Amino acid sequence: MLSQFTRSLSCFVKPTPPKLNKLTRTMTVLPKILQDARPKVSPELDYSTYSNYQNFKINHTDLNLNISFDDSIVNGFVTFNLNKIDKSCNEIRLDTSFLTVDSVEIDDAKVDFQLKDRLEPLGSQLIINPPTATSLNNEFNLKLGFSTTKDCTALQWLNGEQTSSGKPYVFSQLEAIHARALFPCFDTPSVKSTFNAAITSTLPVVFSGIEQSVVDNGNGTKTYNFKQSVPIPAYLIGIASGDLVSGEIGPRSKVYTEPFRLKDCEWEFSGDVEKFIQAAEKIIFPYEWGTYDILVNVNSYPYGGMESPNMTFATPTLIAYDKSNIDVIAHELAHSWSGNLVTNCSWNHFWLNEGWTVYLERRIVAAIHGEATRHFSALIGWNDLANSISAMKNPDRFSTLIQNLNDGTDPDEAFSSVPYEKGFNLLFHLETILGGPKEFDPFIKHYFTKFSKKSLDSYQFFDTLFEFFADKREILDAVDWETWLYKPGMPPKPKFITTLADNVYSLAEKWATEIKNGNTTEDDLKQAFTAADIKDFNSNQIVLFLDTLVQNKEIQWNNHHTAAKTLLKIYEDSIVKSRNAEVVFRTYRFEITAQLKESYPQLAEWLATVGRMKFVRPGYRLLNSVDRPLALATFEKLQNIYHPICKALVKQDLEA
């Protein structure tokens, strides 16, 4: 279980610091709080890898994979074309996790290797020793034969009974440290390479690259060939195979999914994706990846989306039948610049990926739907951040913006809304104090141009910020950097435009006032409220309405069962009958908060239909808070339908 995924420092192999490069030697003098926290080298070393990545440059990577649904394994070969950076280096160290390594070759000659004992959570270090140091050329090819195992955390396998088509399905999820469970690699966001992939399967395959050709092997399998011309880190690799069909949703975009979902997906995404791309290009610079496709995955997919280049992996909970959840696509698209082109060098600085991406996502949405929409989304995000921090087991550690995972803590354990929403709020604050978008937008272009195809730490970002706004040094010096970056808890709240929220807050306050005044019978409330109150609310406004009701500490809904039931009855069409997963989850949270016992088994049944951790983890926590036996029994029944990461984290939540 993940609560045990922490190793002693004595088990940790500290990376060897690289030689100081030009970027390291020319650092800006930052405010003292930042200067004191600055790592000795920039970018900071990644302590979540056992590889000696700093000794090599990966020029290119070739993947040759076979997918076996019968055995639930992926096997094959990976070949790295490498240059030595450290000329004295005489061994190669790679990351693996639950892999079988069959062979290792350097320039076509077999060499000895040693697979070290597994140390949780980072896996088993693979050490490759050439016969002599001189046999390791300055440029060489490293080829490894391998196979995944039944314990693989990188893949989820579904049999035909678990899919709508009756055919098996497999998909990968490699962020943060699970690429090492798919193939031996330098599993760190600090290094990138171009990729070619040849993947053989009995069913269609998608990959994080552009398809080049499909070869029919004449034995019931086909080999799908892909090319990724932009250098990417290993965690961005995405693979899925199953009964997949596709439809066009824009001039450079397709959606892939199971056949029964195709029409719904085409309707949900058509017309909007290209608008998002064009809006993003105006804010940053032209899209570099060629195509932008979307894979709508099976129900058990654990995240809202994963920014695999050229092929965004998305949750089916985005299909809301009203386009109200499509902002997630704006988020994953924004990753094409923040995260995929410009990447955090380690998971300590994850906010550089996600905070920037949320910021760009909301700028994209604002360009299409108006500035008030951006601020409204930020308000919902603020509530998500507050809920996330309040639910943390260890908020003192995991609610700071810059993390310290250098003791080998699993980055999955630190996953929360903090890097997303706290990161966004910092960038929004900087935009505001520096003069608004007109002043901040040139910096956006400069930052993403400067670090394109590179990895960096937070301090390199701050160097660039202070250099660019040298004429506004006093403004930047006045920022409370300690609170924003290093203190746990909520950040200072920016001033948001509340135009789209005012009616929501007003209605929620009216409900609170009626209840406080003792008007709690069904007749009383039906005289004060009607379905027309929210008929013009969009799904996001309904989400905020339900959030606000639950967060009002003056009203203990568990003491007002009749009022809670009446609210749901009055707004049944907009709330109870909603097919939007965001609304459905908030409805269950409201019902659980009110301790409406009839909702307990209904929530348990819903947890069998979703795999997205945004809903599954808090769903089990809610159920556990009111009916622990039901929560445990539900998880025991359903645990094997969830992704391995989701399963492990829910187990941890229930054991807390």
UniProtKB/Swiss-Prot annotation:
Gene3D superfamilies with a match to the protein in the record: 3.30.2010.30, Neutral Protease Domain 2, Peptidase M1, leukotriene A4 hydrolase/aminopeptidase C-terminal domain, tricorn interacting facor f3 domain
One example GO MF annotation: epoxide hydrolase activity
Enzyme Commission numbers on file: 3.4.11.-, 3.3.2.10
A biological process from GO: lipid metabolic process
InterPro entries on file: Aminopeptidase_N-like_N, Aminopeptidase_N-like_N_sf, ARM-type_fold, LTA4H, LTA4H_cat, M1_LTA-4_hydro/amino_C_sf, M1_LTA4H, Peptidase_M1
Enzyme class, first EC level, given as a word: hydrolase
A GO-annotated cellular component: nucleus
SUPFAM superfamilies: ARM repeat, Leukotriene A4 hydrolase N-terminal domain, Metalloproteases ('zincins'), catalytic domain
Catalytic activity: an epoxide + H2O = an ethanediol
Major localization listed first in the record, in broad terms: cytoplasm
The keyword Nucleus appears for this protein: yes
UniProt binding sites for substrate: Q173, L174, E175, P302, Y303, G304, G305, M306, E307
Compartment(s) of residence: Cytoplasm; Nucleus
Co-factor remark: Binds 1 zinc ion per subunit.
Active site, per annotation: E332, Y420
Binding positions (Zn(2+)): H331, H335, E354
Keywords: Cytoplasm, Hydrolase, Metal-binding, Metalloprotease, Nucleus, Protease, Zinc
SMART domains associated with the record: Leuk-A4-hydro_C
Pfam families: Leuk-A4-hydro_C, Peptidase_M1, Peptidase_M1_N
Function recorded in the entry: Aminopeptidase that preferentially cleaves di- and tripeptides. Also has low epoxide hydrolase activity (in vitro). Can hydrolyze the epoxide leukotriene LTA(4) but it forms preferentially 5,6-dihydroxy-7,9,11,14-eicosatetraenoic acid rather than the cytokine leukotriene B(4) as the product compared to the homologous mammalian enzyme (in vitro).
Family, as annotated: Belongs to the peptidase M1 family.
Protein name: Leucine aminopeptidase 2
Organism: Vanderwaltozyma polyspora (strain ATCC 22028 / DSM 70294 / BCRC 21397 / CBS 2163 / NBRC 10782 / NRRL Y-8283 / UCD 57-17) (Kluyveromyces polysporus)
Lineage of the species this protein comes from: Eukaryota, Fungi, Dikarya, Ascomycota, Saccharomycotina
